[in-house]
Amino acid sequence: MRLFNWRRQAVLNAMPLVKPDQVRTPWHEFWRRFRRQHMAMTAALFVILLIVVAIFARWIAPYDAENYFDYDNLNNGPSLQHWFGVDSLGRDIFSRVLVGAQISLAAGVFAVFIGAAIGTLLGLLAGYYEGWWDRLIMRICDVLFAFPGILLAIAVVAVLGSGIANVIIAVAIFSIPAFARLVRGNTLVLKQQTFIESARSIGASDMTVLLRHILPGTVSSIVVFFTMRIGTSIISAASLSFLGLGAQPPTPEWGAMLDEARADMVIAPHVAVFPVLAIFLTVLAFNLLGDGLRDALDPKIKG
């Protein structure tokens, strides 16, 4: 017995001590992989800055984005007084771009959130129950996929009427099938796993299996796709506003600003350049952030 205890103590003494700060949780592993991606980190910082600017835009903007008019500097280019210049009505473009970030970002995020919520629910039902549920939901998705996203959004806005709220609904509708297919595919794979069969064998209800076991397994894919989809939604919302179907003047939405700038693009190109640059940088940042999240959450994809 003493010999056994002596050997046991020797083994315990030989084992390295693991300090609490050396234990790597999934979050630590994710952060370790993500911070190595410099482009994704830069994009994340830009997105955070954009969100802060969007929240406090009306306090940060040096001039009123809708009711300030400088009639002495119509269509003047960038200057110390007006960093991005002035449009044909004397409005400060820098202030309008800042406030436009609030509107464009909100439209993109809310549209994707609605599409993700409905699409995730439909994808879970289609993948888990299969049968006629699967066939019905996927046929509806096929019909929606048959139309280009922007064309479908135009059709929806034509029925509902113009306005930023209807643009959000329109963009959300063509986001639904994309999320539904993504979640359905993940659900079909997860439902075959042993832990799902174990949960069923102990009497877990379908709702419990879906919400406690399958849905968490799809979260990483949803987060990545959600992030990248925001850029698409911002472009779609701006396109609808550019066509006169979205935000209406004098609302400082980026697409609406481009619509107003069309008549002056030759004599005052800066009126269109800065809204375009804002859209480009925002969409690029969300796409790079989505790529970084994908590689950090599932490094096997990168390999």
Curated annotation (Swiss-Prot):
Domain of life of the native organism: Bacteria
Record field: transmembrane: 40-60, 105-125, 144-164, 165-185, 222-242, 266-286
Keyword Acetylation carried by entry: no
SUPFAM superfamilies: MetI-like
Keyword annotations of the record: Cell inner membrane, Cell membrane, Membrane, Transmembrane, Transmembrane helix, Transport
GO molecular function list: dipeptide transmembrane transporter activity
Alphabetical list of Pfam families matching this protein: BPD_transp_1 (PF00528), OppC_N (PF12911)
InterPro entries, per the entry: BP-dependent_transpt_permease, MetI-like, MetI-like_sf, OppC_N
Membrane-topology descriptor: Multi-pass membrane protein
One GO CC term, this protein: plasma membrane
CDD domains: TM_PBP2
Family note: Belongs to the binding-protein-dependent transport system permease family.
Function: Part of the ABC transporter complex GsiABCD involved in glutathione import. Probably responsible for the translocation of the substrate across the membrane.
Name of the protein in its database record: Glutathione transport system permease protein GsiD
